[in-house]
Regions:
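Early extracytoplasmic/lumenal segment of secretory-pathway proteins
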Residues: 27-104, 114-115, 221
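Alpha-to-beta junction loops
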Residues: 84-90, 148-150, 211-220
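Solvent-exposed loop/turn segments at secondary-structure junctions
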Residues: 41-44, 74-77, 95-99, 133-136, ...
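A conserved helix-loop-strand patch within extracytoplasmic ligand-binding domains
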Residues: 102-175
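Extracellular/periplasmic juxtamembrane helices and adjacent flexible linkers that interface
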Residues: 258-338
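Short, low-complexity disordered leader/linker segments with a strong preference
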Residues: 1-33
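Stable alpha-helical elements in mature extracytoplasmic
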Residues: 41-45, 49, 77, 86, ...
Length: 338
């Protein structure tokens, strides 16, 4: 892990007293506060996790910690942080959105190596949420391009989940058409012609489908779909497509902010603790796939662990995928506006 000795010493001097004989760190203030800027679908996860972390931090340091949450479409959230929304940590939908904050000079190089599993403490995938009984008999991506099917998915220009949705559909079409890009684009175009509304974030899309009754199928984060079924077991069911994508949400400390506020210790521990057994089970209980493979196996009755998943590496990594598909004038714009 990259060390930042000068900034770390400055931060520690502001908030702690070091016991010269015992080597024990004593936290002078009674309380500390941090802000976690996250994406749309993590509200329930962090509501539960924050309570666990508050107990952990209190036991470890004697300090109370107040945690403020901010949620929205991942791309939009990254832009907000880059433009001045003060976040001690970010827990966003994908690596590229954290890179955008790094490019703004707020996060140091090498952030992806700061925490285990490429700073992805949990993963997810993309599934379909349909109405109970599956009246349109939706089984796979092919069914989403039928003319009588209304699709709900967020806008990939603002939502991280929407970008995962798009790439999962692209992977299916690539397999179906043996890499013929013209046919792939036609397939994606037909899918988006069926989209009734492009909400800015995944939670907004869920609201459109679940609460407003729009559409026949919601392309959704796996955890978001499971939460809907949990809340409305008589109204919805999940369909797992034949091909999907390994979605890897990313976490990072916002270095410039924590060094200014003197919150590096608590911010780093906040993200480190996501890898603890307790936090990994909190992730699983909220329908995220734990990065700890042993704990993931505890949820084999919940998740389809044999699902065929492509990865972002199949698209050349996030930088290439963003530039090719989601940049202004990229393939998504060409398809959607064409």
């Amino acid at each position: 892990m990259k060390r930042r000795w000068k900034s770390a010493v400055a931060a520690l001097a502001a908030i702690v007293t070091i016991g010269s004989l015992t080597g024990v760190t004593t936290y002078a203030a009674d309380s500390v506060s941090i802000t976690n800027v996250s994406y749309d679908s993590t509200r329930e996860l962090y509501e539960q996790y924050n309570k666990s972390f508050q107990e952990h931090w209190k036991e470890k340091t004697g300090q109370d910690v107040e945690i403020t949450q901010s949620h929205g479409g991942s791309g939009k959230q990254a832009l907000e942080v880059a433009n001045g929304l003060e976040a001690d940590v970010v827990t966003l939908a994908l690596e590229y959105d954290v890179d955008a904050i790094q490019d703004a000079g707020l996060i140091d190089d090498g952030w992806v190596d700061e925490f285990p599993e490429d700073s992805a403490p949990y993963t997810s995938t993309i599934v379909f949420l349909v109405r109970k009984g599956n009246p349109k008999n939706i089984k796979d991506w092919d069914d989403l391009v039928k003319k009588d099917v209304g699709v709900i998915t967020p806008n990939p220009k603002t939502s991280g989940g929407a970008r995962w949705n798009y790439l999962a559909a692209w992977a299916y079409a690539k397999d179906k058409y043996n890499g013929d890009e013209d046919k792939i684009k036609e397939f994606i175009g037909d899918l988006y012609k069926n989209v009734l509304v492009l909400d800015t974030g995944a939670r907004g899309a869920t609201t459109s489908f679940v609460e407003n009754g729009q559409g026949d199928v919601l392309i959704a984060w796996e955890n978001e779909a499971y939460l809907s079924v949990k809340d409305y077991p008589d109204d919805y069911e999940i369909v797992t497509p034949s091909i999907s994508i390994l979605a890897q949400p990313s976490v990072a400390v916002v270095d410039k902010v924590v060094d200014k506020r003197g919150t590096r210790d608590v911010a780093e521990e906040y993200l480190n603790y996501l890898y603890s057994d307790e936090a990994q089970r909190i992730a699983g209980d909220n329908y995220y796939r734990p990065s700890n493979q042993d704990i993931l196996k505890e949820y084999s009755d919940v998740f389809d662990l044999d699902i065929n998943l492509v990865t972002i590496d199949d698209f050349g990594g996030w930088k290439k995928a963003q530039e090719t598909h989601f940049s202004d004038g990229g393939i998504f714009d060409q398809i959607y506006e064409g």
